Amino acid sequence: PGGSDGIFVFSAAAAGLAVGACVTVTGTAKEFNGLTELDKPTITPKADCAPVLPTALTTLPVSDADKEQYEGMLVAPQGTYTITNNYALNQFGQVGLAVGDQPLYQATDVVAPGAAAAEYEAENLKKYITLDDGSSWDYMRNTTAQGSPLPYLSQEEPMRTGSQVTFAKPVILDYRFQWNYQPTGQIVGATDADDPLTTENDREATPPAVGGNLKLAAFNVLNYFTELGEDEDEFKNCPYYADREGDPVTTNFCEVRGAWTDAAFEDQKAKLMSAVNGLGSSVVALMEIENSAGVTWVDRDRDYTLREFVDSLNAAGGHWAYVPSPVVTPATEDVIRTAFIYNPDLVRPVDTSYIQMDSAFANARYPLAQRWQAPKSSTQFVTVANHFKSKSSGDDDGTGQGLSNPSREAQAHALTSWTSQMWPAKPIFLMGDFNAYSKETPVSIIESAGFTELEKKYEPTSATYQFSGRLGSLDHVFANQSALSLVTGAGVWDINADESIAMQYSRRNYNVTDFYTTSQFASSDHDPVVVGLQVRVPSQK
């Protein structure tokens, strides 16, 4: 009682056995990286035996000790699971699952940093298990694996985080680096007979309905660079990430950060054109678009790539203009920047744009502000595009909010102080990638200055980003009290963060299955945030 009735047999001879074959196995049990197995066994065929029936798992065992009672056994997981991690699907054929009808969220997107966040994450861990593909293949490095279709994934079954699954077939509970459900055979492609899952396709064809007669959007476009890696390579060495045939696709820590070849750039562009034109927005704040003046090996003005972006959008059926950079710009800047594009039929810029050249943003992107007015409307409002310091480098303040959190706090203070001084009586929207989850201190600083975070107000469980099997919002739109009276709704268009990275242009031809399409899905790694506004026009009473 309390012991497992199954065990993994480590033997080359086992490869010739079919599921359901009867054998007698003798050997020495041992532990290998946490997995109990029989080593150097003797395997003898047997005439008959009792059938192996799966043991129902009505709930996922929580502790290691509880799971070990079922280790190596055929089990039938019951109820609903939700995909919460698909990042390793592209490399190891693995899907992270959470028990229940919700994915797992970043703790600091839900509760305050510190003890509450630690407690929240401890509960996350109790709900998590990986579904493996029945193999140890590395689809990024193993050439045989690259020539075999990725398991589980297709356009029809995109295996998005947040989508719900149930188990239609039994699996084996085992331990390899972490606790896993293993199918009873290797999964090859999306329609393998041993695939144990029933899945759903919950892709959203259109943005959320947010009402109003104007729409704002904030969108990180994932390093959109017209300057290519192959061009930089003519001036200085520019390493690249290659597909399965060794052909370059994207840059690898070069000065430019996007596509390496023109073909890859066209793939990237087509997806972004579908996404941005599909937003139907009046004003879009862009993050991670090339700052052409910051590329040292070409002589471009700051707006060169922004103009190209707008020209491409219009060639694809859009109707856009861009906000030119102001005359005075920072002396030194990052090679990526923020920008505004807009539909000139719906809204017009008032005066020039402004860049907040505060030293707090020296390690990030300087905020870009623009005042707007709709034709025939007396209402003016201000939007500020932001891209705070990332979590990937800098000092750790020990609060569990990622690296460089003090920098983001200083940026939040500087931003709110500047905007309140510049436009004390105007509706103000702070938009963009703040690199801070919804309960982290930079967000709290902005809210304490009188701003309301809109997507959580209207969609409390929304998320714009996926990292390490957890969902959360790094991208936000904040409204001050005056702006809040204009807002009719807000939401996240879930087209990117939930998608497998295999669907992105940057992974094209990494596998024999071509997952690339020109659709909006996986056009970036961040989801756009959309906000509806109602501004008065003369016909309204």
What name fits each language-model region?
Residues 1-249, 356-366, 408, 413, ...:
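Extended non-catalytic accessory segments flanking core domains
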Residues 8-9, 25, 37, 75-77, ...:
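Structural recognition of the beta-strand scaffold that forms the well-ordered cores
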Residues 14-16, 30-33, 44-45, 82, ...:
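Solvent-exposed loop/turn segments at secondary-structure junctions
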Residues 22-24, 74, 78, 170, ...:
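Extracytoplasmic/secreted proteins, especially bacterial periplasmic and envelope-associated proteins
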Residues 25-34, 40-48, 80, 84, ...:
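Sec-exported extracytoplasmic/periplasmic mature domains
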Residues 152-157, 161-169, 173-181, 187-203, ...:
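Metal-dependent phosphoester-hydrolase catalytic domains
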Residues 190-338, 374, 396-416, 497-521, ...:
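N-terminal, active-site-proximal structural segment of metallo-dependent hydrolase catalytic domains
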Residues 379, 385-405:
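Active-site His/acidic residue clusters
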